[in-house]
From Swiss-Prot:
Job of this protein: Allows the formation of correctly charged Asn-tRNA(Asn) or Gln-tRNA(Gln) through the transamidation of misacylated Asp-tRNA(Asn) or Glu-tRNA(Gln) in organisms which lack either or both of asparaginyl-tRNA or glutaminyl-tRNA synthetases. The reaction takes place in the presence of glutamine and ATP through an activated phospho-Asp-tRNA(Asn) or phospho-Glu-tRNA(Gln).
Subunit composition and interactions: Heterotrimer of A, B and C subunits.
Alphabetical UniProt keywords: ATP-binding, Ligase, Nucleotide-binding, Protein biosynthesis
Domain of life: Bacteria
PANTHER family: GLUTAMYL-TRNA(GLN) AMIDOTRANSFERASE SUBUNIT C, MITOCHONDRIAL
Family: Belongs to the GatC family.
Official protein name in the record: Aspartyl/glutamyl-tRNA(Asn/Gln) amidotransferase subunit C
Enzyme class: ligase
Bilayer-crossing regions: none
NCBIfam families assigned: gatC
Reactions it catalyzes: L-glutamyl-tRNA(Gln) + L-glutamine + ATP + H2O = L-glutaminyl-tRNA(Gln) + L-glutamate + ADP + phosphate + H(+); L-aspartyl-tRNA(Asn) + L-glutamine + ATP + H2O = L-asparaginyl-tRNA(Asn) + L-glutamate + ADP + phosphate + 2 H(+)
EC nos: 6.3.5.-
Species per Swiss-Prot/TrEMBL record: Aliarcobacter butzleri (strain RM4018) (Arcobacter butzleri)
GO molecular function, one term: glutaminyl-tRNA synthase (glutamine-hydrolyzing) activity
């Protein structure tokens, strides 16, 4: 996969983020390094390794699912969103 200006523009649009022009070259280099690293994983022979679902013997310990409301944190996060309304993020429609 080639990391070029077209890919960066697509990622900017999908993420609703904007990358400064002076940072784009560094970002392209970093993304290319990440992709090359991940592509190296395709060369690893795992045919003799048994599949596992957890690294913890006996399964993953569960915790009670409890909700917490922190209005100060919520407001802080929403203040940094490009668009928000009534405590929710407003995002562009992507599915017709």
């Amino acid at each position: 996969m080639t990391v070029d200006d077209k890919l960066i523009a697509k990622l900017e649009k999908l993420s609703s983020l904007q990358v400064d022009d002076e940072r784009k070259e560094k970002l392209k280099s970093e993304l290319a390094d990440i992709i090359n690293f991940v592509e190296n994983l395709n060369d690893i022979d795992v045919s003799n390794i048994e599949a596992t679902f957890s690294t913890i013997e006996g399964g993953t310990p569960l915790r009670e699912d409890t909700s917490k409301q922190d209005l100060e944190l919520s407001n802080h996060i929403l203040n940094h969103a490009p668009k928000s309304e009534d405590g929710y993020f407003i995002v562009p429609k992507i599915i017709e």
